């Protein structure tokens, strides 16, 4: 087995989730890196011990482990394609707990089969739920789970409390917390507004339809 000590670990995005992940990694005695469209304040970088990269290419070429914590939008859809993965260190790892479509499905499989990537882990798929014949189920050196791996009983209690607060504020006509806000008055809003780019990512509905076979088709049809 292996451990993280001494490795270069980088996060793609350092918003609420990305920064929290980096803080949790600090006690493991790793060298922490991040890329984000908006650089964190100098005092935060110093406190956590972060090295900033002004491009995702710079980040992935430096780190042995890359964790993806950015939202899915036009600029990040298919970001980890064959070209970007080729810039990663030989034998590096990707952890994707953001969105499945941020990574090119076949590019991940090819990199694992060729040995360029040592491993890929995550709890996000495209389409989701993943059909039985999804290639990520059978590719080598993967650590995939359903998109429920972080849903502990404690987390579910926090989700419920957050939903209740949002509904209570909505019915009372009160302003929502910035961290709970995504869109306001027709525009991006809240603490994560700067993380997105204008436009829409592809719906993926036609691509997803290609995977509708057997149990998956029955499940989709039952939800209509």
Language model: regions and residue ranges:
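Gly/Ala-rich phosphate-binding loop of Rossmann-like dinucleotide-binding domains
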Residues: 22, 26, 112-113
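C-terminal helix-to-coil terminal segments
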Residues: 126-224
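Glycine-rich NAD(P)-binding loop of Rossmann-like domains
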Residues: 1-20
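Rossmann-like adenosine-cofactor binding region
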Residues: 39-135
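Conserved acidic E/D residue at the C-terminus of a beta-strand in Rossmann-like folds
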Residues: 36
């Amino acid at each position: 087995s292996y451990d993280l000590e001494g490795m270069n670990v980088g996060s793609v995005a350092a918003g609420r989730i990305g920064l929290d992940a980096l803080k949790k990694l600090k006690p493991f005695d790793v060298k922490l890196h991040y890329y984000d469209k908006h650089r964190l304040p100098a005092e935060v970088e110093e406190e956590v011990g972060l090295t900033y990269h002004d491009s995702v290419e710079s980040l992935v070429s430096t780190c042995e482990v890359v964790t993806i914590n950015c939202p899915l939008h036009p600029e990040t859809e298919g970001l980890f394609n064959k070209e970007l993965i080729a810039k990663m260190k030989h034998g590096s790892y990707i952890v994707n707990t953001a969105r499945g479509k941020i990574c090119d499905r076949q590019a991940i499989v090819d990199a694992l089969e060729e040995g360029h990537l040592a491993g890929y882990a995550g709890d996000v798929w495209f389409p989701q739920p993943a059909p039985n014949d999804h290639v990520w189920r059978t590719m080598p050196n993967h650590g995939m789970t359903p998109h429920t791996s972080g849903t502990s009983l404690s987390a579910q209690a926090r989700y419920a409390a957050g939903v209740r607060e949002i509904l209570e504020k909505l019915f009372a006509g009160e302003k929502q917390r910035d961290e709970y806000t995504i869109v306001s008055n027709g525009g991006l809003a809240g603490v994560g507004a700067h993380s997105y780019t204008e436009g829409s990512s592809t719906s993926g509905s036609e691509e997803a339809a290609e995977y509708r076979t057997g149990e998956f088709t029955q499940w989709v049809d039952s939800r209509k």
